[in-house]
Amino acid sequence: MTTILKGYYLKVTLENRIVKHNGRKVYLSIVEHGNGIPDHALILKTTAKCVKFSVCLSIRSQCGWKELDQNDSGELTFDLKVEVTGKSQRAPLFPLIFQLCEKNYDQVTLISKSVIPVKAITKIPKKSLRAELVPLGESPTKPPQAFPASPSDLISSKEYDDEFDGGNGGNSGTNGDGDDGGCSLGGLADENDYEDGMVIDENGNVCSSGSGDGGGGGGGGGDISPKLTSSLNNLKSSISNTSLSSLGNSLNNSLNGTNSQMLQYQQQQQQQQQQHGNLNVSGNNINNNRDTNVSGNNNNNNNSTTTTTTTTTTTTHSNNSNMGGSKKPLNNSNSNIHFLTNQQNSDTPLSNSSSSTPTLSPAQSAISSPTLSNIINSNSNSTSNLNDLIKDSSQPSTSTSTSTSSSSSSSSSSSSSSSSSSSSSSSSSSSSSSSSSSSSSSSSSSSSSSSSSSSSSSSSSSSSQPTLNQHSKYIPKSLHSSLSSIPINNKENNNNNNNRDNRDKDICTTSPNLNDSINNTLDLFNKKINSNNNNNNNNSNNNNNISSQERPLLNSPHVQLTHQQQQQQQQQQQQQQQQHQQQHQKIGMSKSSSELQVPSSNYHKQSDDLNPLDFLSAIATMGSNSLSSILCKDDSKTNTNKDKDNNNSNSNKDSSNNNNNNNNNNNNNNNNNNNNNNNNNNNNNNNNNNNNNNNNNNNNNNNINNNEDLLPNPGSSKFAKYSADQSVSSSSLNTPLSSPIVKSQSYQQPQSQSQQRSQSPLPLHNNISSINTSIHNAINSLKPKPLHLSSPSIPTTSPDAPYRLPSLNSSSNNINNQSDYWSAINPINSSGTNITNNNYNNNNNNYNNNNNNNNNNNNNNNNNNNNNNNNNNNNSNSNNNNNNNNNNNNINNNNSNSNNNMNSNNNNNNINNINNNNNNNNNNNNNNNNNNNNNNNNNNNNNSNSNNNNCNNNNNGGSNIHSLNNSSNSVNYNNNNNNNNNNINKDKKNKKKLSASTPIFGESNLGDIINNVIDEHQLNSNNNNNNNTPHFSFNNNSLKELKPLKRKASIRNSSGGVITNENGWTTIVNNNNNNNNNNNNNNNNNNNNNNNNNNNNNISSNLPIISGLLSLSKVDSTSVDKL
């Protein structure tokens, strides 16, 4: 159930009318309602208690009436979904008929009336549909686009300037009236019976509307547009040469002294009556006070129903009612509309056949293009007719009863008379008959209500006549300036004036004022904004209250509000506001509160920029933009403070942590490399953290940790809520490292971070300076301590070396793995964990990030399934054991490998050491991990599948930093490693490959720092197996090759794919180093996996250094120099 703003209706135009489907021509039935309104929505505005509608399909007769109750906004809304079953898989057309349960036809306004769409197989080009919101009473920007009755009409249908051509129709009236063909009962039995140009009446009967005998489409005769053009030219010249006073005199003369013209007119009417047998003319007044049917179709078909009200009949002249004339009405030219009433104006397509639809919209009755044709049809009377219009537009309306019915009858008679006059056999009589037909047709509209005498036809003539300006859209633009220069004394808008007076007693008096409704809506909207700003002052409400005088769109005679009325409205609105201060308050729209919320929370920040006039005009010109996009300024942005704990829930939110970013498909998270996971990637990190499910990355857990950095507040967020089988508690996740590194990083409130996000150009870290500080503290906090491993402590080149490795303490929460070696380099996440460390444990080089788990050897995590729990174990187990926990020889434990230095294995993997091979023999520790993580698809190693898993990272689409490794093993430095080469560094080929994808550092200074660290610390760990001594040897050359690249630089992976962030940040770093090589090792074991990295999951598996520095891709030089 959807509605649109009161006071507006949605006009939908179908540009392309026919498409081919399965080699057959099919009429399009789908109408896309723009502005968030579903295809099947139709909106009514009425004061009646209920309305019933009928809908009939063209293939299967499915007709039914349904009563609708109006909502509290006074609108009738319904969702109509028609199932088309059986063979009717095409797009059937079905006209829609409305009828009020009560006979208050003058109290209903059709806001949107069109062919109700049925979703069909046929695809419709987007360009073929055009939707626009049009204020009630305003004429739309373009004339109606009618459905052609038959394929032949398509040929003659051209741009809208040619829309009113008579087409290539037959001789005058030889093809008969539109519905002469009649309607066959029962509909069509089979889809093969479906023919182009069929129309269905309200009873579900198929009516032939094609050209030919009985058809409605072929009756239109020759070109009208040339005559129209010449008439306009004559009118232009006569206007320039004639003063208004002379025009008035000539008009009076033509009205009072042309008895011969009236006689001719009566003769023509008698001829028409002989053909149609139902129109009686007495004296100069047509329809005197008699109830007559004006639409010839109805008499012929007997299918149409004409509804009579108290004094007059409301009749709808169909497009095809030529009244015996030789030509089709002007506005009908090449369109036999598939609606059951005439589409008389561009506002509302009325159905076109035998049914009578008494509910004409105000704008409908206001526009009658045939009258314009009558006015300008002859050179001699064009000026007098113009003056007639001028006089009538300034005179008040005298009709007192059902204006809608009178306007419809006038329009029908005018169209019939225009067609008859235009088809007169002699050119001399055509000029004389046109003026008389215009005056007589105008008098017919008022005769039913005011019983005027024959001499008073001019005074009451066009109570429903449109003014010249209303027809301006039918006049070439080149003539607009000339016509607009005429000083016509119209009160108010010419577009609305004529028929508004007639409607005083229906819509404007008996139904809620549409402008008042809009005023109320805007006032409520503004007041809601003011209440959010804690400004509930009456003054602010008054300022926001826009009177009708201030609204040019609504400047109609009936919109003016007295000061007292405005005060009453304001008081009522204030009372309503007090009752509805909840977020789900309805803003004058009948949409359910759960679907449409008044902008709240942070939305008030923009309230100063909201101008109610702009708001209203924006809605009026919205085009295809959704109303929700204007009224509900992106709920995802307004709820930033709501879902602090649900960072992952809203993909649009920047939630305070980068994590979200990662999650966002946008890959905004370059930082995290680790993040790659992004939801998509499964990349270990996030996925693991959040769902371990992804596992893909064996390292999952590890990576997961990385994400944690990005999470807003691990203690309160979903991140801390592990499943029951997981042993990691939120407190353990929040436990800072014993290293002072953690203390240097403080968690910032999500609100301040959200502000930083809006200001910071970086897509990743919210606070670069804090990261720089943490790195600085991390580097300075490193003190030389002995390593508690079977291998000797890492030698330092000099006793005064500024960068030293922290001691690895099996009992501490710090990551015992040698990965701590890199902790000095890695940035610290918001939770204080080093981004990379754990990765080593993960065998899979997940240096990345894992940190969060720190405690847990990433490997364990991996092995242990996504559960980071393992990590804890690892820590307590002193790394080696940890692996055991994983069962699958956590690489670290070497158990399976028998290699004592779990770290070394990891390190090797991460760094270059192919050592893995040794440990697992074929299964590098990583592989073991893989095995452990059967869950993790990633376990590439063991599982050849792993490749795919690795791809996971790739899945990120390369957007994630890790993506380098993407499925194509994108960067597999591994290739070299596949041979189980122990020292990647030794492999010159590897160096070349590494240089192919160099990481990007924010500043070259950071690269120098890393080189210094590596120069001073080369780890030589002796494994029990002398054969494979893990050897950390970073080639200075290879690191030096990692030169800073420009921000938008792109890196090509081994598969030739360019990896860049959507944001334009080159996120890729991983591979770059020897690390990948290690991963390769894994692959070596399982060369199949190639993904090597896969297991590692984190493509980032590359050097933790790189993954850490990645986030610093845009650091100001001063902060780096301090390091």
UniProtKB/Swiss-Prot annotation:
Organism classification: Eukaryota, Amoebozoa, Evosea, Eumycetozoa, Dictyostelia
Biased composition (Polar residues): 329-343, 590-604, 790-799
Region of interest (Disordered), residue spans: 136-229, 262-471, 483-514, 527-609, 629-769, 782-812, 835-1005, 1070-1099
Extent of Basic and acidic residues compositional bias: 632-646
Domain of life: Eukaryota
Regions of compositional bias (Low complexity) in chain numbering: 262-322, 344-387, 397-464, 489-499, 527-548, 563-585, 647-707, 727-769, 835-984, 1070-1098
Bias-annotated ranges (Gly residues): 166-185, 211-223
Biased composition (Acidic residues): 190-199
Annotated organism of origin: Dictyostelium discoideum (Social amoeba)
Protein name: Putative uncharacterized protein DDB_G0277255
